[in-house]
Amino acid sequence: KTIEQTMEKLTDGARRLAAQLTTTASFDSLWSVLTDYDRLNLFIPNLLSSKKIFRNETNLHVRQVGSQDFLGLKFSAEVLLDLYEEKENGLIKFNLIKGDFRKFEGYWKIQSISNTGKNSLIYDLTVKGCQWMPIGMIEKRLKRDLSDNLIAVERQAKLVS
């Protein structure tokens, strides 16, 4: 599976990571998987829980807990995210309300690739760790996780279509 990735070091110590996957999964199945917030932890690796706690017309709040084994230690982090859905543009933006990161924001985007019957699935994340979580130490892990997340979403989308 070919995944294009970029990683950028930002001036404030944050990292911006982006990953893109081309898939034959349909827009509707990808959208349905990405917006099934209460079940994301069932197929996204290292996501222990995901729970929608508020929703109105365009915004929702989701609490998520992720877990990692890093250098033999189990590490978990919690985030409360504000999400904004634009289905007509295939876009889900997210911003940190509060949590174990100083910054955790970005978007998921589904884009159709002209004349191919395929879609591009993009995950773009800007993240800044806390004092006890130096981002430089975990950036390789984050890059791998972004790829794993894309593959997991694609696999689930093909199952539901």
Would you name each region that the model predicts?
Residues 22-26, 65-69, 84-86, 97, ...:
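Solvent-exposed residues in well-ordered beta-strands and their adjoining turns
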Residues 18-21, 50-52, 77-85, 105-112:
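Hydrophobic/aromatic beta-strand elements that line small-molecule binding cavities or substrate pockets
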Residues 26-32, 75, 138-145, 149:
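Short amphipathic alpha-helical segments
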Residues 10, 51-98, 151-160:
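Glycine-rich portal/gate segments that line the openings of hydrophobic small-molecule binding cavities
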Residues 95-144, 148:
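Beta-strand/loop substructures that line and gate deep hydrophobic ligand-binding cavities in soluble
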Residues 29-34, 40, 83, 121-123, ...:
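Hydrophobic pocket/interface hotspot
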Residues 14-16, 57-59, 76, 103, ...:
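A general secondary-structure signal for short beta-strands and their flanking turns/coil
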Residues 1-59:
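Hydrophobic ligand-binding cavity/cleft-lining segments
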